[in-house]
Amino acid sequence: MILILTQCFPSRIGGIENLMFNLCYYLGKNNKVIVFADQHDFIRDSIFDNKYKNNFLVRRFSGIKFFRKRNKIKELEEIISLNKVKAIICDSWKSFEIPSKKLKFKNIPSICLIHGNEIIIKNKNHHKRIKNTLKNVDKIVSNSEYTK
């Protein structure tokens, strides 16, 4: 089983959304994939999720960001405790920030995608958050030479 944590997933339209969909779709051909995604439009998200239910399972989380993140973590921990997980893939360091602290000792390989705009350092605290999160990731995949 592969778990994918993402803030950016269809039914929303965008480059990262496309990337995450294709990643799930093709990994789902040979693996059980569960996607933990934010919910943006209940009806469109439900139609999309139903269309691809044979390829991967999508768990949607809505509400205030603070609670949404924690609800994802709670369900993530439950799934990990009940299943053998091959890997966890995140669309961003922000998707991995809270889980990285909780999953540190689970010995599950982790992959984090990094995109140019999201690693622009805003202040010392922001830089520290990024650095502390990424040091807990097994593999970092950047989308450009600039991002490396």
Residue ranges and their predicted role:
Residues 7-13, 20, 25-68:
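N-terminal strand-loop element at the rim of the active site
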Residues 90-96:
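Short His-centered aromatic/hydrophobic patch
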